[in-house]
Amino acid sequence: MGAGLAPRGANGALLAATQAARGHAAAGGGNKGVNEGGSAAAAVGAGTGSGSGLDGGHGHGGGLVGQRVLDLHAGSGSGGGGSTLLPPPAGRSGADGGGGGGGRKSSPSLIAATLAASRSVSPARGPIPQLDLNGGGGKVTRKRGQSVGAASVIVGSVGPRHEAEVLDTASIPPTTSLVSLFEGKREANDVDPVKKRAPSVRRKDMDTEEQARKERASQEPQKVKPKPVPKPKPKPEVATDVAVPKSSDDAHGASEGTSRLGGTGRSGHGDERGRAEAKPSQRRARSQHSEHKPAKKPKPAQHRPPTPPPSLPTRSPSNHVVSQPKRVAKTPRLEPPTPPVKTSTIAKMAEPIVQVTPVEPDIDQVDVFHHQDRNPKPRQVSQGSTSSNDSFVSASSVPSGAVSPVREVESTPRRPAPPARSPSSRSISTPNPPRQQASHPSTPNLTLSSLTNAMMASNLASARLTPTTPSQPPPLPAPRRSGRSPLQPHHTADSIGSQLTGGSKSPNHAAHQQKQRTGMLQTLRSPHASLSDDEDARRQHHHRRRSKVLSGGNRKHAHHEGSRRRWRDEITARERKRYEAVWASNRGLFLRPGWAAQYQNTTTATTGGASPTQQGHGPGTGEETQHQTRDQAVEASRASHGAEAELVVNVVARDIWSRSRLPADELAEVWDLVDRGARGALGRDEFVVGLWLIDQRLRGRKIPARVSQSVWDSAAGGYQGVVVPLPGGGAGGGGRKGRRA
């Protein structure tokens, strides 16, 4: 048996790969001899323990593969106890105790590949009990360190149970339970890390799971739960490298003790009891060893170093108890675990803030794998699920257990600068956490003092500003009077009506309304003189020009010099009527024949020998009497009939024209233009033309050198050839009986 044993540190997959060809070649001699009832199969079936060509090295492929093939045929041929290997697809012919499995057609290379796959599931953790072919019966020996899965299959197969029962009870149910637990934890972690349950509830669930696990372990002490196969992810590998080496050392130490027990006692039942007693002690040693380790080892797998202090309390080594790390403020990116050197420095900075709680001593190896799988899960969920990152983070969604670490960190005056990010974090980090940085942690950073300082600064700034006076707007530019006369009044009845109705056709509508707001409201009456003498202001402007001019052509852009209106052409009917009214009220005064001598006699007789005060009945009555006497004398001087009744004397014309406040030389110039008879009095047409020239001069127009005939014709009003009789039959000079006014 010594020649068939492989070295302790040898890898089963490597040996199977190197000897696959030789094993296939050995199938020609070894398997043939077994099928034909050769010496190897007969010797093993009889239980003599003599080696065959495959076992002792006499055959072609001596070594581990030949040993396993021999074990397979030995177990199937002897009929005592189950085989240590999985049965070939041919069936269970060897279990009947027949003569060597004559119906088997599987090659040794297939069996070697199956052995290599079963051994290379995980690193070696302990020795594997196998049947002693030399001793026969149920004796168990330790050959080499193999995986936990292989050990569980072998231990379950040793005994009087059937091979089908070994597969159903020993291997599948623990795997199914572990997978269900793993998926349950994954579903529990598949939510937003901010909206998870409180740590206290999670702790209670873990306690109940540990109690149930202890009860199962006490009821079935002979079973060893195989290690679950975790997903090949880069994050759990760091945690596995931290926790596995210590447990593997314990496993090697326990394997040596178990091999000593197997060497001293060779009976089958005694060896099973020793193995059953060794396994619980080995499990307790592992749990006690893992109790002292989490304070130092699991930190590299559970810390996220490049985050500010608000996120350190929730990502501390206390995640063994609280499995969901919660995202607090100031997490710009979700980073993968960094190298252990940086992690140790960040862990030392975080130690004064967070207290590490040790794990309970009664935790087995399966719990360690659960915690290792449980801690990286929230990172994977936060990277994969975008809906949880996009959710709105409010104050009510944050658990109450995560509030106190944040306040504790905020009370510290200084925050350490975050270290440089690893280059792999660019591809893993998501862009969504900065949005939560803008919404959730903005309010804690604004303290009460900063808010009050900002409010006081704004109040002081507003108080120091000089108050502006909006009541006096800047002056408006002068309006452009295109197409209007410079003497046109600014406000007319049309503009006032448009302002009251709300519509305006002029560009100065806003200026008019602003002026009206400052003063009192105006009525429909125009504020300025709407009854102006300027006929140009009353004309309608901006009308479309006549399409046909005097020449008959359709030249819209011609100047039409002969068809335009000129102020020197004629006097309008309205102006003529106004001037005639002034003439009618002043005509014939002081022109009654013999009026001067009669006026002198009347004044002397009235004021004869007494003073005006003596004639009156009180003070002031003399002045009133004089005014009345003067008015009566003036009215008595008016000529009632004859040619003198149509004239306005020069003194009366001078008195009326002097009210225009024009210089005396200009008034004399106007008199020379209109006094055509040189008789010291003006007729109706002459007086009307004189008033019209004075009005034109007041509007800024020059006094013409001569008055055109059209103006005289318009002043006559259709009455041509009015004969004005001269008083005294030509004594006034001129020798002409009359002239056309």
From Swiss-Prot:
Residues 183-195, 202-218, 268-280, 367-376, 624-633 have a biased composition (Basic and acidic residues). Residues 26-36, 46-65, 94-104 have a biased composition (Gly residues). It comes from the Eukaryota. Residues 629-718 form the EH domain. One of its GO terms (biological process) is lipid metabolic process. Residues 385-406, 603-616 have a biased composition (Low complexity). Residues 18-151, 183-567, 603-641 are annotated as: Disordered. Residues 303-312 have a biased composition (Pro residues). The keyword Lipid metabolism applies. Positive regulator of phosphatidylinositol 4,5-bisphosphate turnover and negatively regulates signaling through the cell integrity pathway. Involved in rDNA silencing. Belongs to the IRS4 family. This is Increased rDNA silencing protein 4.
